[in-house]
Swiss-Prot record:
It comes from Stenotrophomonas maltophilia (strain K279a). Pyruvate binds at T46, I204. Belongs to the DapA family. It is found in: Cytoplasm. The keyword Lyase applies. It holds the Pfam family DHDPS. PANTHER family: 4-HYDROXY-2-OXOGLUTARATE ALDOLASE, MITOCHONDRIAL, DIHYDRODIPICOLINATE SYNTHASE. One of its GO terms (biological process) is lysine biosynthetic process via diaminopimelate. This is 4-hydroxy-tetrahydrodipicolinate synthase. The record marks S45, Y108 as: Part of a proton relay during catalysis.
Length: 297
């Protein structure tokens, strides 16, 4: 399955007591299908993967594959700090039916660029799934350089990158690597429209948890080079781009999900949205239904 358009980095709904909320998860999957997204990510950073037990990871991924697998890609977050553990987690995701592994640069350990190349080649060779690289230095402390990506893009089982560094120079460098065998995806909602217009393949989004149709519409218009309509949709979504960054992800988007009846709180060490942002969350939640309705016209 190709990787393009809008892919939602799914949040993981929990109940008020902190337990996994399977009913909320099913409602979130339904919302994404209704919104026409082109793929989903299960158990990434937005999904609070670091807080999940193995049993919870299995339940989330297996149920997502059962509900939407075969229709759109179901990517699984499998990146961990060690190579052997990442391979093991990738094999686990393959056995559960994931279409791709989204593999973040190893957090905390800060490998060299040569170390990244060796790490990703090992995962691609031994993990059993097509690998999508994921660069988000603000979270991991490790910035995978375009030259490193170029080295990895030639591997037949490394099929794309989610790049969360949204600056123009980085996007241009990665565009040179784009091919039918290697997709370039934005990991930054706020700069995605500009990047897609420049030629990248799509967006792995946080905001589309609550606005799948609206973010899909923005991505489709950007890919079609309808500049005026793209700018109009990007402007409508700008308050959501901004709000999702007022506190560490996924705190803000989970506050919005709670306001539309999906899930409750987060797991420690993340805390619920600060009271100073509640009014903004209430206001934005009130706009969601109208924006989703408009996106279908």
């Amino acid at each position: 399955m190709s990787l393009s358009g809008l892919i939602t980095a799914l949040a993981t709904p929990f109940r008020a007591d902190g337990a996994l909320d399977p009913d909320g998860w099913q409602r979130l999957l339904h919302l994404q299908l209704e919104g026409g997204v082109h793929g989903v990510v299960v158990a990434g950073s937005t999904g609070e993967a670091a807080t999940l037990t193995d049993a919870e990871y299995d339940l989330l991924l297996a149920s997502a594959v059962e509900r939407i697998g075969g229709r759109i890609p179901v990517m699984a977050g499998t990146g961990l700090s060690g190579t052997a553990k990442t391979i093991e987690q990738t094999r686990r995701a393959a056995a559960l039916g994931a279409s791709h592994a989204l593999v973040v640069t190893p957090p905390y350990v800060r490998p060299t660029q040569a170390g990244l190349i060796a790490h990703y080649r090992a995962v691609a060779d031994q993990g059993g799934l097509p690998v999508v690289l994921y660069n988000v230095p603000g979270r991991t402390g490790c910035d995978m350089q375009p030259e490193t990506v170029a080295e990895l893009a030639s591997h037949p089982n490394i099929v794309g990158i989610k790049e969360a560094v949204g600056d123009t120079g980085r996007v241009q460098a990665l565009l040179a690597l784009r091919s039918p065998q290697f997709a370039v995806l934005s990991g930054d909602d706020g700069t995605a429209a500009r990047s897609i217009r420049a030629g990248i393949d799509g967006l792995i989004s946080v905001g589309s948890n609550v606005l799948p149709g609206a973010y899909r519409r923005m991505c489709e218009l950007a890919a079609a080079h309808d500049h005026e309509a793209t700018e109009s949709w990007d402007a409508r979504l700008q308050p959501f781009h901004d709000f999702c960054g007022v506190e560490p992800n996924p705190i803000p988007v989970k506050a919005l999900l709670r306001r539309i009846g999906i899930g409750h709180d987060l797991r420690l060490p993340l805390l619920p949205l600060s009271a100073s942002h509640h009014a903004a969350a209430d206001h934005l939640a009130g706009d969601i239904a109208a924006l989703e309705a408009l996106s279908s016209h």
